[in-house]
């Protein structure tokens, strides 16, 4: 009898301990999940703040001028939380999902997805390409220039180029190709020996105007072209460059690869942020000037192209696109990185249009790598009048 009571006591104690362990484990698990939920909420709030930071003028908010650069990091972190909740507590999925829902506008701006739709008959092809001085003539002693060959193959109806400056030999070679492709063209320079942008068109160019803004080396030009009975405004832009040197880009690549440590990372990071912020402050009034020009001509048919030197989550992109349709967001797919030099992959080249145009199959073509930019092109079809 005593032995039986002792056995019952042992069983009871073991049961109590198991219950205590279960309770303790449950408490630890609950605390851990609450901790993860808090971290997820913090990630969502930061993601939202950064996603809508493109409303902030860099001149007034210097520190946040380039916050958009880290937006994809928080998108990815939030996605990792989504996977975690699916594995451990499905109700928690609501946190990252609501984050993406509230962040829909910047999310779609940064990485759009659209159902592909072939361009209809009558659509015109528009291409914008920072040609990096045609990648330097000395690189191609055989006389074959991939960028010119690519342009010839694309057969764009309207072509806007940035960094199109060449020497006398280069100019002769460019002209020998482009004169056969386009009857109408114009070039403009920020100053003698400075940045050069160019437009080539299958339609007559009837006027040209420089959009005035402060810059030592960059510029925007507005043209009127005549297509049938329509007069279309074409705006070609090359906004303030980042000013990053080869050494700066090399430092950035080293940071990404983890080749720098400790104070070296901190020093290089501060230096890069300072340079990028300085460029953003210069770029903001340029973007404002372009946006004012667009606002002044609301109701007109407008196609705007160029190298903004700023990401989709930026003040420059936001203010210029306010009264226009971003053709890549409307008809492109994926992040569409158009700059690829020095370990930096960002979409900084754009095609936009007024509401009387419908964009189709906007694409950043990564097949040609001779410039530090990839070309972006799109088909545009005039909408029928209501």
Put a short name on every predicted segment:
Residues 124, 155-157, 230-232, 298-301:
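Loop/turn elements at helix/coil->beta-strand transitions in domains of secreted/extracellular proteins
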Residues 100-121, 138, 148-149, 158-254, ...:
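Structured beta-strand-rich core segments of catalytic domains in phosphoester-bond hydrolases
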Residues 123-135, 231-240, 269-272, 276:
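Active-site-proximal beta-strand elements of phosphoester/diester hydrolases
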Residues 249-275:
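A solvent-exposed, charged loop/short amphipathic helix patch at secondary-structure junctions
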Residues 129-131, 163-164, 239, 307-308, ...:
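Active-site metal-binding loops of divalent metal-dependent hydrolases
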Residues 2-176, 189-195, 287-288, 382-386:
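N-terminal, active-site-proximal structural segment of metallo-dependent hydrolase catalytic domains
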């Amino acid at each position: 009898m005593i032995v039986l009571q002792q056995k019952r006591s042992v069983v009871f104690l073991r049961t109590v301990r198991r219950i205590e362990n279960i309770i303790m484990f449950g408490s630890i698990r609950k605390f851990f999940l609450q901790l993860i939920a808090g971290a997820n909420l913090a990630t969502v709030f930061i993601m939202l703040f950064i996603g809508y930071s493109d409303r902030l003028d860099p001149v007034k908010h210097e520190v946040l001028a380039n916050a958009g650069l880290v937006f994809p990091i928080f998108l990815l972190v939030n996605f990792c939380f989504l996977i975690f909740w699916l594995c451990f507590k499905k109700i928690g999925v609501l946190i990252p999902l609501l984050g993406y829902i509230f962040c829909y506008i910047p999310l779609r701006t940064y990485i759009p997805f659209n159902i592909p739709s072939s361009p209809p008959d009558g659509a015109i092809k528009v291409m914008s390409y920072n040609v990096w001085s045609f990648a330097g003539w000395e690189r191609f002693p055989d006389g074959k220039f991939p960028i010119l060959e690519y342009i010839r193959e694309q057969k764009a109806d309207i072509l806007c180029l940035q960094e199109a400056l060449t020497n006398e030999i280069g100019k002769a070679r460019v002209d020998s190709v482009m004169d056969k492709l386009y009857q109408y063209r114009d070039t403009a320079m920020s100053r003698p020996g400075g940045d050069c942008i160019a437009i080539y068109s299958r339609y007559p160019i009837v006027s040209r105007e420089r959009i005035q803004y402060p810059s030592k080396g960059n510029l925007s030009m507005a043209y009127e072209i005549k297509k049938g009975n329509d007069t279309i405004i074409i705006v070609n832009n090359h906004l303030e460059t980042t000013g990053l040197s080869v050494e700066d880009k090399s430092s950035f690549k080293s940071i990404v690869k983890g080749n720098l440590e400790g104070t070296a990372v901190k020093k290089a990071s501060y230096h890069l942020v300072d340079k990028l912020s300085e460029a953003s402050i210069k770029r903001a009034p340029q973007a404002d000037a372009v946006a004012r020009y667009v606002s002044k001509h609301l109701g007109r048919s407008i196609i705007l192209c160029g190298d903004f030197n700023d990401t989709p989550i930026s003040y420059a992109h936001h203010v210029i696109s306010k009264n226009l349709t971003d053709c890549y967001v409307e008809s492109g797919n994926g992040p569409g990185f158009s700059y690829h030099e020095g370990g930096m992959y960002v979409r900084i080249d754009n095609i936009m249009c007024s509401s009387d145009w419908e964009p189709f199959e906007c694409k950043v073509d990564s097949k040609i790598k001779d410039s530090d930019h990839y070309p972006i092109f799109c088909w545009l079809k005039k909408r029928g009048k209501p």
